[in-house]
Amino acid sequence: MHLTLQSVYPAIIIIFFLYKKIKRSIGYQPLKPRWLFTRIILFSLFAFGLSIFSAIHPFLYGYLILGILGGWLLVFFAKKNISFEKRRGKIYFRTHIWVEVILLTLFLSRFLYRVTELYLTSPDLNRLGSYSQSIGTDPLTIGVCFLIAVYYIGFSSFIIKLSRNELEQHEYNKEKDILAR
């Protein structure tokens, strides 16, 4: 195995985006309903694509069901442990640190596993269909990806719903303060 610029540049870009993802997901995040709605759409399309792919390998539906159950379990736990904070007129939110750690660990472990597997088996990728067959033999990656997709769809939907109520309550309190003066 030798390192070339062809493999170093993508690795640097991937590491940069992983760093941004980790930094953004730990701690308070600004409440941006438009971004949350975009996240719902993207993860819904991703989950739909995984569901379609599972039609080729029907045994993967079991892993998708486990991903759904795990994702909803994390959403349920995150709903119970969400906290909001107001700074300089903006609303920030965060969920429990263990939910964030579980998601990051699952994502990073499966991501690194798949990248390592692809790097080690790169000569086999010249054959048509070998990548699809390698995914079919590793259903845990699909289950984990579906778990993450279900979590982000459910949690983002919950935050959007909660933020509407929070913003309405905030506007009501503002009007009440103005009338009290």
UniProtKB/Swiss-Prot annotation:
Keywords: Cell membrane, Membrane, Sporulation, Transmembrane, Transmembrane helix. Induction: Transcription is activated at hour 4 of sporulation, requires sigma-K and is repressed by GerE. Maximal expression depends on SpoIIID. One of its GO terms (cellular component) is plasma membrane. Its main location: membrane. The keyword Ligase does not apply. The chain crosses the membrane at residues 5-22, 35-57, 61-78, 91-113, 140-162. It is found in: Cell membrane. This is Protein csk22. It is a multi-pass membrane protein. The gene is csk22. One of its GO terms (biological process) is sporulation resulting in formation of a cellular spore.
